[in-house]
Curated annotation (Swiss-Prot):
Stored SUPFAM superfamilies: PurM C-terminal domain-like (SSF56042), PurM N-terminal domain-like (SSF55326)
Organism: Rhodopirellula baltica (strain DSM 10527 / NCIMB 13988 / SH1)
Extra information: Reaction mechanism of ThiL seems to utilize a direct, inline transfer of the gamma-phosphate of ATP to TMP rather than a phosphorylated enzyme intermediate.
Annotated binding of ATP, by residue: 109, 126-127, 151, 200
Record's protein name: Thiamine-monophosphate kinase
Reaction catalyzed: thiamine phosphate + ATP = thiamine diphosphate + ADP
Pfam families for the chain: AIRS, AIRS_C
Length: 316
């Protein structure tokens, strides 16, 4: 439902000149008005928003409210990182259950403020309301960049990378995600990232979205896919393989990105503080393809969480 409705909105909303990147990427990019100074870089505003709802995106009876507040900030920060931007400020809106509203707000804000301090984000404003319903948290984060990373910039031959390790987030990592804000800043200073996206709905599904936006595909070396220890643990109970969890589990909040092949060696030889793994290359034919022999590839299909739907095509 989400992707089809976004397509509908793109057709209905008016694209004004100040909106450089609108609906369809990890965040919007808004150009500042006025002339560009000859001796100052032009900074572009990046804005993203996410809402999480009790009973849908989290369960307040099973998780600490502080963790929920931290996560609400982190998922937005992950979108900012995927744009290659620096976060600056946030607007926080809470819709609170009327019963114990003050206590709930205080505990949620403990996590929000912890994340804000960790990633140097100012809480600039927001709104509070109470009603007879579940807790809802909506956060908008504003950031800036000179040149945003988009989903649309992948080029044939680009080397594909993913940060961190994938899969098994439901065993606990999803409670306190680590958005790759610092890593994105280091990448920005070191290489020219052509396209990027964060892994929120599943590695394969989000990779496919980035490539579709670029009208490209990918040839993947699935044996190189970085699989988390949690994915191995989860596989012991789920009946699925660790690779299947890495392929499709959501809420990893890692970054997928691509660079020109001549810059791949820079990525691989640099200590980024977290693992950054080469997993394949961008190709001109659409779709995802896995290597099965020296020069033979088979089509594989994305799988992950789709808002308003049950699943997408099987991964194999």
């Amino acid at each position: 439902m989400e992707q089809s409705f976004l397509a509908y909105l793109r057709g209905r909303t008016r694209q004004l000149p100040q909106v450089a990147v609108g609906i369809g990427d990890d965040a919007a990019v808004i150009d500042w008005p006025g002339s560009v100074s000859s001796d100052q870089p032009q900074l572009r505003q990046v804005a993203c928003t996410d809402q999480i709802l009790d009973g849908v995106d989290f369960r307040s009876e099973e998780q600490s409210l502080s963790d929920i507040g931290f996560k609400a900030m982190a998922i937005n920060l992950s979108d900012i990182a995927a744009m290659g931007a620096t976060p600056s400020s946030a607007l926080v809106t809470l819709a609170l259950p009327a019963e114990n509203a003050t206590e709930i707000a205080g505990e949620v804000y403990e996590g929000i403020l912890e994340a804000a301090q960790k990633y140097q984000v100012a809480i600039a404003g927001g709104d509070l309301s109470t009603y007879d319903g579940p807790l809802s948290i909506s956060i908008t984060i504003l950031g800036w960049t000179e040149q945003p990373w988009l989903r649309t910039g992948a080029e044939e031959g680009d080397a594909l990378f993913v940060t961190g390790a994938l899969g098994g987030s439901l065993l606990g990592r999803h409670l306190r995600p680590e958005p790759r804000v610092e890593l994105a800043a280091k990448l920005k200073q070191t290489v020219n990232v052509h396209a990027a996206i964060d892994v929120s709905d599943g590695f394969s599904l989000d990779l496919d979205r980035m490539l579709a936006a670029s009208r490209m595909g990918a040839e993947l070396e699935l044996e190189t896919l970085p699989i988390s220890e949690a994915a191995h643990q989860f596989a012991e109970k789920s009946g699925r393989t660790p690779l299947e969890h890495a392929w499709s589990d959501g809420e990893d909040f890692e970054l997928i990105f691509c660079v020109a092949p001549e810059e791949a060696a820079i990525i691989e030889s640099t200590d980024w503080g977290v693992p950054v793994t080469r997993v394949g290359k961008v190709v001109g034919r659409t779709g995802l393809w896995k290597r099965v022999a020296t020069s033979k590839f088979e089509r594989v299909f994305p799988q992950g969480f789709v808002h308003g739907e049950t699943d997408v095509a099987a991964a194999n």
